[in-house]
Amino acid sequence: MKMHPIISLIILSVGFSQQLPKVVETYKNGNIRNITFHKETQTGIEKDKYEAYHYTGRKASEGTYLNGKEDGLWTYWYENGQKRWEGTVKNGQRNGLWTYWHENGQKGSEVTYTDRKEGGLQTKFHLDKECWNEDGNVCECGQYWWEGCK
């Protein structure tokens, strides 16, 4: 009969072991600098998710981990709250389409990464939409700066 409390204790400890504490670092002003979430795996404890914050408290970045390496969607923000860049990471390396924005929120470029290198389609967006015709006069740009005047 004494075995039941021991078995209950083991079952309780295994059941609660999935809820691992998050690690929180703060700035001197008390605001959160970053939060690292962990999970228990067959090989031990490893990072699961990461969030970083600007000194002011706004979110700076977030992403996920797999097998201890960055993996999945990663997003970064400017301090004003606008997206800075976003894309997918696989096994710790950029992979697939990454989108970059200017601080004012306008899209700056799209780059496709293959085998850890920029490759494939790359699209750059003109920030101020100022184009010139053959005579040197300013005109309204097409959708992309390289299209020239409308």
Which residues are covered by each model-predicted region?
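Hydrophobic h-region of N-terminal signal peptides that target proteins for export
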Residues: 9-17
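Absolute protein N-terminus
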Residues: 1-2, 18
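Sec-dependent signal peptide recognition
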Residues: 2-9
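Periodic aromatic/glycine/histidine/acidic cluster detector
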Residues: 16-78, 82-90, 94-102, 106-150
